[in-house]
From Swiss-Prot:
Family annotation (InterPro entries): Enolpyruvate_Tfrase_dom, Enolpyruvate_Tfrase_sf, MurA_subfamily, RNA3'P_cycl/enolpyr_Trfase_a/b, UDP_GlcNAc_COvinyl_MurA
Listed SUPFAM superfamilies: EPT/RTPC-like
Record PTM 2-(S-cysteinyl)pyruvic acid O-phosphothioketal, positions in chain: 114
Protein name in UniProt: UDP-N-acetylglucosamine 1-carboxyvinyltransferase
Keywords: Cell cycle, Cell division, Cell shape, Cell wall biogenesis/degradation, Cytoplasm, Peptidoglycan synthesis, Pyruvate, Transferase
Catalytic activity: phosphoenolpyruvate + UDP-N-acetyl-alpha-D-glucosamine = UDP-N-acetyl-3-O-(1-carboxyvinyl)-alpha-D-glucosamine + phosphate
Enzyme Commission numbers on file: 2.5.1.7
Any Pfam family matching the protein: EPSP_synthase
Amino acid sequence: MGYFKVKNSILNGNVRISGAKNSALPILAATILSSEKLEIENVPDLLDVQTMIEILRKIGKKVIFENNKVTLNGTVENHVVPYDLVRKMRASFNVAGPLAVILGESKVSLPGGCAIGVRPVDYHIMGLKKLGFEVEIEHGEVYIKKGKKEKEVIINLPFPSVGATEHLMTTAALMEGTTVIENAAMEPEIVDLQNFLNSLGAKIQGAGSRKIVIEGVNSLNGGSYKVIPDRIEAGTYAIAIAATGGKGYIEEIIPEHLEILWEILKETGTNVIIEKNRVFVDGEGKKRGININIQPYPGFPTDLQPQILVYLSLADGVSMVVENVFKNRFHHIDELVRMGADIRVVDGTAIVNGVKKLSGTKVEGTDLRATAALIIAGLVAEGTTEVHNDFHVLRGYENIVEKIRHLNGEIEHIV
């Protein structure tokens, strides 16, 4: 396994944001529903995307991925998704429902992904059963068989799960009758998935609200679609520029997708100027502590919690960050403490006492966003930091070394 060697740097300049990983993956899973030619543009070249493409190839789709464009043709033929692919990421489970819709059955292993606490597929399975599927779990495998769906089905999610909302919305698109998802997740990536499916002839409305209504259609057409920008990547670079005391533009983004982050940065002493499709961040000022509640969208995203903790670790005063989405998402704190941060966790709340400096050392990333946060910590720390378990970041950040270097950051990828 490789690692990143990171040195103290002030980030300055402009960074162009890639397409959203968390849109591209469910959109690619949804291509199972169409046998026509599809072109998906602005797809980031990431390990997770490569894994999803390999899954689609294994089940029969013809896929070409070049220059951030995925071209797909053909129908699915194989209802079994291999364990060695599914174990690599959670989003792979989203092929289970669509595959069973087309072939009448599917067999998918329970998924892997980031180790950040309990992320059960229970909500997915509950919803699939509501849609009339028979679901059995044996020896880590999920067997799904298509049954008879009622004309009108209401699925009330116990928690606004992004993955379950996307999975059930996609699955219901080609199922007869009406499906209503209550307490749906509201993330922009769900709106993007709805727009993609509707561009092919689906009849879905309400994405972006707590209630999504799907009127089943018989088939989906082909077409072209462009994935939205990655708001989490945008937020990561905005926090990195601010934390290092630099200045720069986050470009080719949809600023309203990160309104809560811009507010937090402003309140803590970072200057933020919002333009049409880019945001200017000036982190030269002194930073102040703040309290943050991590919540589903439109609240502060859990996928930016590790990064904002690094930023707050050098802010004056005390900050409290309450994690309400993934209660165990604090594995990065031990590594930050080793670098000199003063952070402790009490009942799902990170209490941060700002310090004057962090010091470089060897650290290990435990998941995608935690590893990105440790790279930011390496940029603000004195000396050199080695961030190990590079594969985590390669799952979710396209060209991260090149982009940080373009901002005048000192980083090297040792393979």
